[in-house]
Amino acid sequence: MSVSGLPFDDFRTLLRDLPGPDARALVTARERDAQLTKPPGALGRLEEIAFWLAAWTGRTPAVNRPLVAIFAGNHGVTRQGITPFPPAVTQQMVENFAAGGAAINQICVAYDLGLKVFDLALDYPTGDITEEAALSERDCAATMAFGMEAIAGGTDLLCIGEMGIGNTTIAAAINYALYGGSARDWVGPGTGSEGEMLERKIAAVEKAVELHGDHLDDPLEIMRRLGGREIAAMAGAILAARMERIPVLIDGYVATAAAAILKAANPSALDHCLIGHVSAEPGHLRAIEMLGKTPLLALGMRLGEGTGAALAAGIVKAAAACHSGMATFAQAGVTNKD
């Protein structure tokens, strides 16, 4: 990143100058779809997914190197008693990912997806957002830059996920800051907060947004003050994918909050993204609607780990396979409609 100016300056420049889709590839995909052995529109959203792939990759729809990227971070706000699990669980789950024992590992095997896990200074939780900013601008920008490395090994479909005890509190605070309403609108149980603990979680979100209220007109400031390292890294990964025209599948409530930061900075910033699923976390559907998106799946999941995005990758792979592998009417000797 630049050694001059403020730490966020380079990201602001990138967000102003985002590349768009390949219009010619989109036209070509639509023309081929019209000749495939099916009635127009019969494959529903699979057709739109194929067009989306073509437009962003600039070629015939294909998924050859899908990747799930999980970003793990810890949060100082857990000191407020807002979650039943201790922060140590974040590191333990990272180790579980490495050992192949988590749900995401099984889904990646089932759908032939690559998996990378990014450990984001787990021994150094972010600042407690009810008392101070989560990150300095320099640390936040550096973490965004680190997240951009998610695509370094090459991928043509990036699935964005996370792991972090306390991060549904962070996501709720971001959504509350971006969209308003009340803290209660955005706070859900997460990993199992209920009763008095849930009330503490709501109070923490209210206190954090009030504390930082004078600085919340800038999306990047919202991210550094109310977010976390996995939020910043996911935002960086989504932005890096856009610069390389790599399609992205966004996972659950927390990943959607990271994406919302980019959308607030540039309304077109998520055009290369689809939402993999709507989770059972109460605020997620509303957050998705605020982004103008429609999730691919609704399975009642609320695990995180990129699991919903990974499952949606199977649908995207199927959409590409149908578009590329189906015969045309002429090839199959099937009579087309008049």
Swiss-Prot record:
GO terms for biological process: cobalamin biosynthetic process. Catalyzes the synthesis of alpha-ribazole-5'-phosphate from nicotinate mononucleotide (NAMN) and 5,6-dimethylbenzimidazole (DMB). Gene3D superfamilies: 1.10.1610.10, 3.40.50.10210. HAMAP family: CobT. The active site is at E305. GO terms for molecular function: nicotinate-nucleotide-dimethylbenzimidazole phosphoribosyltransferase activity. It holds the Pfam family DBI_PRT. This is Nicotinate-nucleotide--dimethylbenzimidazole phosphoribosyltransferase. Pathway: Nucleoside biosynthesis; alpha-ribazole biosynthesis; alpha-ribazole from 5,6-dimethylbenzimidazole: step 1/2. It is an enzyme of class 2 (transferase). It catalyses: 5,6-dimethylbenzimidazole + nicotinate beta-D-ribonucleotide = alpha-ribazole 5'-phosphate + nicotinate + H(+). Keywords: Cobalamin biosynthesis, Glycosyltransferase, Transferase. Its EC number is 2.4.2.21. The gene is cobT. Belongs to the CobT family. The lineage of its organism: Bacteria, Pseudomonadati, Pseudomonadota, Alphaproteobacteria, Hyphomicrobiales.
